[in-house]
């Protein structure tokens, strides 16, 4: 079977990770990545051997910078079977008419709203519904985390209600123009936050309400989660359920902070210290009268990356079984949980 030809439109925090993850698979390949300016990220892409495409008006700038572009973004799209749009939130919506004109399958990120594709994706929750689709939205880092945790418990115990409080990192590490630096920001002030409805775009039967704040850190998000379940269980039962999932990591051995999780990722040799798994503190898991509580941490730069690969595989009909795709993706990128 020929490899699926994938274009990555936008080579920033998510795009560069998606490109590397796609390149690691044996059933898909990157035909090109796009950058608007010949900056350091474009230089790295050039050094890594990616064909760079740029807006037609900017091609000369890339030539002068010593990293000649392979062509325009439209030319990149013509070579691909599917485009993964990793542009900043709001830009993806503007790109949709271009994709429609070319007649290419497209994936957007969680910075866009659900209606852009009419379908929101999480591999553990609704992989099979994505098979053969032309348009898909991979949900955000926070929604991906909640969907992983909720769908895992829902399959085994049944979830009646979820209440979650999100402490969101302020910005990614390379975003020097944003904050807060010395403040905790209500985000949003009006409750509930948008994360609950976003979870329901994937798991429509879940009763969930969320609240969110921004805190002055760049490393990870942390959620405090309360679930009301339908079956009797113990904390040990919940640990075993979470521990059975390849994209959930139980973090212990003295780890009590996001800084230590990132250091652990560095120590085990993860590229860019990425932590693709949802990290749950097993000591925090508490069960009282069919209510369970726990903390989990979310590496916002990388948790959605394997999800994008699985979405490609489903949409291109390379694999109809979600569990098999997850296993294949994990193995290729080096996600070994245990």
UniProtKB/Swiss-Prot annotation:
Alphabetized UniProt keyword annotations: Cytoplasm, Glycolysis, NAD, NADP, Oxidoreductase
Gene Ontology CC: cytoplasm
Record: active site: 141 (nucleophile)
Signal peptide coordinates: none
This protein's record includes keyword Cytoplasm: yes
Residues where NAD(+) binds: 13-14, 111, 169, 300
Annotated pathway: Carbohydrate degradation; glycolysis; pyruvate from D-glyceraldehyde 3-phosphate: step 1/5
Main EC class the enzyme belongs to: oxidoreductase
Positions of D-glyceraldehyde 3-phosphate binding: 140-142, 195-196
Main localization, broad class: cytoplasm
Reactions that this protein is recorded to catalyse: D-glyceraldehyde 3-phosphate + phosphate + NADP(+) = (2R)-3-phospho-glyceroyl phosphate + NADPH + H(+); D-glyceraldehyde 3-phosphate + phosphate + NAD(+) = (2R)-3-phospho-glyceroyl phosphate + NADH + H(+)
Listed name of the protein: Glyceraldehyde-3-phosphate dehydrogenase 2
Organism name: Methanosarcina barkeri (strain Fusaro / DSM 804)
Phylogenetic classification of the source organism: Archaea, Methanobacteriati, Methanobacteriota, Stenosarchaea group, Methanomicrobia
